[in-house]
């Protein structure tokens, strides 16, 4: 069992509506997998089940061979290993960029101030924002906020990073800087599970693409294969829709 | 005025223009300077717990000025009306001045009641409001019942229940040291307990609504980096919510300064109590209550000033009123 992440027949309902209808997939270390699919297909729910911001109804999720969906799993320990980047950034609004990054290091990992600061500054530099370390979120652009969000997740040294539509709240001209950071992470071997319709990123960085529709993975494969020879009707129509929406995209 | 900013770079509106700021600042310095000197004088320099304290300013010149102006007004006929009024001002001062030392002592208790009760009430209000917003059903219900019970009944009734209806008074009276020297007597302690409980309920409401105005994604993000729920509230939600709560909370402080006058009904010798007892003895109701009103006004304006400063010190770009851009 060398998979870093194994998702096994996960089901999740909200009331009467079943959002996830038996999802299974696995990721190796260093994989960059992208979940695509129409809105409401369960992509974000799937991500949130992995770090247990949402509790699954049935099925199992293994991180590094360990079942993390048991009742006695320490969710806070799990979340130390699984970072998350949010669509609307969710930077801690009262803290500077640097303190956004150090909070987890100080209060979760118990590092002292100097150590935390050193790590934070290294991560802020990695996303190109060391100069903005003392800025508050309200003083940053959307793209900068999201890069701080990535630095905050990276600082915890996670085994897996989850990205929940990291660029969809951004103005188009700010998408590039975030995608660039993500592509850098991918090339450095970070294991990433990404919900995104940013096809530029998918083509350049994704190992595999999972197409979700109506709570199921209807097709999976390398992006080039799926783009060129989509087998499933849903995949075809979805990718066509994306291409026209993004003006041809390559 | 050049544009001022706080330590964190949030712009602050310029405040009052220069000369009004100077006059206001002078008035505050005079009031607080006199008050503090009076307290120190009456406790340490000429301790005289029995009463009969001499005012710093003699009454004689004011009486004399009143006399002179009155006779001047008389001699001028209709033209003397302004002098008549001016004479009234001196008569008012002459009537008020002898009560100032007692009012200063009363103001001390008013300040103590307010500051101690608002602070202790805050300590209770934070967990209460967190319980209201983030607690389970049981906790939410307990917190809701408490706040509604306290906010739904008269403060005076609460004080009477505590003072006359429970053993609290006897219990506190038997605590060694109570009522000796600088330690206030049991009525003051009961009043502090009553105001603390009452204020906690109101403060909890202000903080509760501030908590709900913090975006839910903030706690989600805190949980996502591995913070527990309580830690997430402590380190992420509360620091923001308390900033949002400052304007409403300041209101509660101002109310409490004035509501503290209800302590007179359980025999606490605070500002209102001193005023009323002197007025009853001297029949100088106008002088006494107008002067007491000016005391309360000065206390309230001071509290507003302090809270404005607190708001400026704690301002963060993007949070709270002064942070809006």
Placement of each model-derived feature along the sequence:
Chain A
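C-terminal boundary and immediately downstream tail of ABC-type ATPase nucleotide-binding domains
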Residues: 224-250
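ABC family nucleotide-binding domain
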Residues: 3-5, 11-214, 218-223
